[in-house]
């Protein structure tokens, strides 16, 4: 044991010189590259404890190398964290590509989505969500995905899913409905995509209400995308829909999406490219 302790002390107090290093006028070892000391003297009381008068010190070269290693390790940990958040947060791998960097810049609501991310802490504190509504293919889901990706890059957990998947998960869940819904509500931001497209059975509507109501009571923001119109939401067909829409509208700011159908444009471009390849 004594030998092991001595070995540790030796390692702590001994500097291994490089070929270009040299001894300065003060008797300390200096780096041959940056000309800064690689050693420093102990205070007299510490020297008596360690049985030697000096200990290793960082020269500029060593400090730079250490900072670069630490920065690389920090980047690696960040990338690992973001990867895990996206693995858990997205239900479709293509959602990873829905980013502001990949945006074509034509959607007039892109600025609003960016500001939501920039002011996330305020949105979170004040429990401000969004209801993206409008026609098919107008970019609602894409911009919701942009918000999700941007927040995950900041290491903020987000879950983006839809009620078709939620209902399937609830039907197959072994952990119980309450625990599943509680897990959804633990995310700082929950995004429900394509709201209103799920089957309108009594069971389905009850589960939709349970999720919306639980999120409502959690005090955490919710973003919803839907093809329903604002008129549909303000004039529900029955009580079951009314209590769902009421909670949505009380927590989510309606944002209208208009303009061209981007999916149709993409399909048209692909068709034209295919025709060109075939006819050439």
Name each model feature, range by range.
Residues 1-104, 267-280:
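A short, basic N-terminal segment
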Residues 88-90, 94-130:
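Pre-Walker A (pre-P-loop) alpha-helix and adjacent loop at the N terminus of AAA/AAA+ ATPase modules
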Residues 108-117, 148-189, 199-206:
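Short glycine-rich substrate-engagement loop in P-loop NTPases that contacts/grips substrate
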Residues 124-144:
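Walker A/P-loop nucleotide-binding motif
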Residues 127-131, 158, 189, 221:
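Residue-level preference for the first positions of well-ordered beta-strands
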Residues 194-195:
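Walker B catalytic acidic pair
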């Amino acid at each position: 044991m004594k030998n092991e302790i001595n070995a540790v002390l030796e390692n702590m107090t001994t500097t291994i010189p490089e070929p270009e290093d040299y001894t300065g006028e003060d008797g300390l070892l200096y780096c041959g590259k940056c000309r800064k000391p690689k050693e420093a003297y102990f205070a007299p009381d510490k020297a008596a404890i360690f049985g030697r008068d000096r200990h290793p010190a960082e020269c500029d070269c060593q400090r730079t190398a250490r900072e670069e290693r630490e920065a690389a390790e920090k980047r690696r940990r960040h990338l690992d964290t973001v990867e895990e958040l996206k693995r858990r947060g997205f239900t479709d791998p293509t959602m990873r590509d829905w980013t502001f960097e990949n945006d074509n810049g034509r959607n007039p609501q892109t600025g609003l989505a960016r500001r939501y991310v920039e002011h996330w802490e305020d949105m979170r504190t004040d429990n401000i969500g969004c209801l993206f509504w409008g026609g098919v293919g107008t970019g609602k889901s894409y911009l919701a995905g942009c918000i999700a990706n941007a927040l995950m890059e900041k290491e903020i957990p987000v879950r983006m899913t839809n009620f078709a998947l939620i209902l399937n998960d609830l039907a197959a869940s072994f952990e119980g409905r309450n625990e599943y819904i509680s897990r959804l509500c633990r995310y700082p931001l929950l995004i429900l995509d394509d709201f209103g497209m799920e089957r309108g059975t009594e069971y389905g509507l009850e589960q939709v209400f349970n999720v919306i109501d639980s999120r409502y009571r959690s005090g955490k923001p919710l973003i919803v995308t839907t093809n329903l119109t604002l008129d549909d939401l303000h004039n529900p067909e029955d009580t079951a829909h009314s209590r769902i829409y009421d909670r949505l509208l009380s927590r989510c700011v309606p944002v209208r999406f208009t303009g061209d159908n981007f999916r149709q444009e993409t399909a048209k471009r692909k068709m034209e490219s295919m025709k060109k390849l075939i006819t050439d």
